[in-house]
Amino acid sequence: MSDCLFCKIAQGEIPCQKIYEDDDVLAFLDISQTTVGHTLVIPKKHFDNFLATPKEIMHKCMDVAQTIGQVQIRDLHAKGVNILSNCYKEAGQTIMHFHIHVIPRYYEGDGFKLEMHENHELPNLNLPAIASSIKKGI
């Protein structure tokens, strides 16, 4: 896509701090470092998000993300890693090109916070019915 920031980076029109590159995948440092070493992994071809990406390409991106996370722990001495991808604006996706954040974690309060809490406004959920609905779609 001509107006996609990540497509422009993948095509070399916008410079980046490249970490890894092959025919299908590019990994580079996020210009907005949440923690030291925060890396983005993208397919070079445009796909809107994780859910729209063909499995072969998604698997290649995940393999690269896994390797980068391992290196961040080994060589940057991170204590852990968050690997995540937001799908759609409502889930926090701001650039509509599939990308995986690989965020090394050094200590609590290091600049990144991901919290999940039980939503008490959803009482009396019928979990078997919800599970059945999802199962039917698989």
What is the role of each PLM region?
Residues 1-138:
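HIT superfamily nucleotide-processing domains
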